[in-house]
């Protein structure tokens, strides 16, 4: 299995900063787990509730030696995930860090009533107390770093918004700063069908802590007899204060702590990297590779990256005051994707790494492609026309609808395209590279009061296979505001500007570009319940067009 280490030896090219490929191939097999000590402890909160913690210790612990501490703070039952934790943390232990793994209140072995939902005030209040406690122990240097993937990436960002004095740096992996539009509940402002992840999480939280799994009256009261958080989310169907509270979006000025953000092209949380790079004034770095929802060192698809090498350099700079040179290097490592077939069993994605000094990249230019009445896609607008589409609420299954969040590798898009309005370019005579968030501009109408629109960009290979490159959905009732949605007036035309999700792709010579539009992506997102027909303006100044960055 290929494992790559990011190296600081870079050289410039006309397309940005590129790494020496020979150095990128350094194998990390010499880093092997060793025997490290694990101890358990309680961390008492100000209200008397105790949180359960595991401490993973470096080998060279002596009585008077102090270490910086890395915190992973999760609701995922630490006692039953020690195999995962030991393998993950060993790299940090070998490099002179203690790692603390703490169960959130009311989860795993921690005491208290289960937190009411993700990233609640009580979770984050407790997090501040945990950081303070870790910083004051005799074996602590007083400098804490925080890291995590998914939930642990989210609350790392949120703790950075609170700026506890001992927290010196964080790393957020596969997480987002925009809870309403990009978490697993209302992707693109539309309810995720079933929210199955949240229901499974509620069930996990109801289980007593290991190893006793004690089922008594206290367990009934504090774990089992608690309202499932999925009901809380079902009542928060519009953007607003509930989501703002723990979203960095719109509150970037609160983050004073240096952050390193890692995303994946096949993960649903990748948009946040761009916003953090562009808006946070504290030091920021970012990396995005060809990965689904995994840490990059054991990710699928490959190539994998030993991200912990970068993490140690990052934390060494901020927690040990070692000049690792990491701040003198480019801010943004990007894996540029070449074509691959629409095969969900692919083990490796073809492409290459590029290092960029900043975001947005100044040399990027937008290229506008217009839909034409003959269903072609061209660089010039055509004559005005209107195309009609009969609504099918079940549409989406054919194109990989079960993928929860515009992640993973969807199957061939041809079956879904047959139920959509599609617009194809001529065969490309030169490669065409995009990097960023394409924007689809539409003028539409519907015969019902509620409708969604889905826009997909795909690559048509010479053999006819259609690979999805970028996509997004839009809730038509949010055309003016996601905070104050209003029904569509049947038959009335209005404009939509849809930001597709962050993507990178090189359309190869001999391939074609496809833009497809329809009104559902089931069973990823809940469809609207009304039979209808939708129309889209083609051609002229306001017809369907897509801006490719």
Regions found by a protein language model. Name each.
Residues 13-14:
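N-terminal signal peptide c-region/cleavage motif recognized by signal peptidases
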Residues 25-65, 424, 428-430:
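N-terminal cap/lid segment of alpha/beta-hydrolase-fold proteins
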Residues 61-136, 455, 461-463, 522:
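Cap/lid segment of the alpha/beta-hydrolase catalytic domain
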Residues 86, 94, 161-254:
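Accessory cap/linker subdomain of secreted extracellular hydrolases
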Residues 139-150:
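Alpha/beta-hydrolase fold nucleophile elbow
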Residues 149-158:
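Glycine-rich nucleophile elbow surrounding the catalytic serine of serine-hydrolase chemistry
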Residues 230-288:
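Serine-hydrolase catalytic core
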Residues 287, 296-297, 301-549:
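C-terminal, loop-rich substrate-recognition/catalytic regions characterized by aromatic stacking residues
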